[in-house]
Amino acid sequence: GAEQFFSRAFDFGYSKSPDETLKFWGHQKILSDVDWVIRKFRPDVIITRFPTTGEGGHGHHTASAILAGEAFDAAADPTKFPEQLKQGVTVWQAKRLLWNTFNFGSTNTQRDDQFKIDCGGYNPILGKSYGEIAAASRSQHKSQGFGVAAQRGSVIEYLKTIKGTAPANDLFDDVDVSWQRAGNKNLANTINKVIEKFDVL
């Protein structure tokens, strides 16, 4: 499932530029919020919805992408927001930061050389495709009346690497996703034995 985090930034209406947005929010204050989340949650991959270059069409959107890039670096730098390190978090370097490009209206930022993933998989446990789950989620957007039709089948998303190493074959290239990462070899062995002996019948 997903976990949602909040900063002290809030939607104050249409903003013409990221500079206006960051001035209103307090650039360093909000950057520290994003930095804290990265250090606490420790993501391996960070994906932004909007670019830093303005195609998102809204100051808040562009500012969020700028903050993501700055926090990607700051979270790994012990000289940035050092007071956080006394509150139970440590520095953290995510493997990569990507921008999920889009083709919306008259703006197409997708390119053939960008990394592609198919988000249209089906979850047999939930009995729904990820497109259906996403549609249900968007229908809960309270302030702007969003909503999209549920869909099944292939949904290709394009991702442009902004910082860190670019993925070649998988979004989690060079990331340890095994149980060994939990730091408990016995746990990994136990899980492997359970999987080996599991009989659905």
What is each PLM-predicted segment?
Residues 74-201:
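The feature marks non-catalytic terminal segments
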Residues 1-81, 103:
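Active-site beta-strand->loop->alpha-helix modules in alpha/beta enzyme cores, enriched
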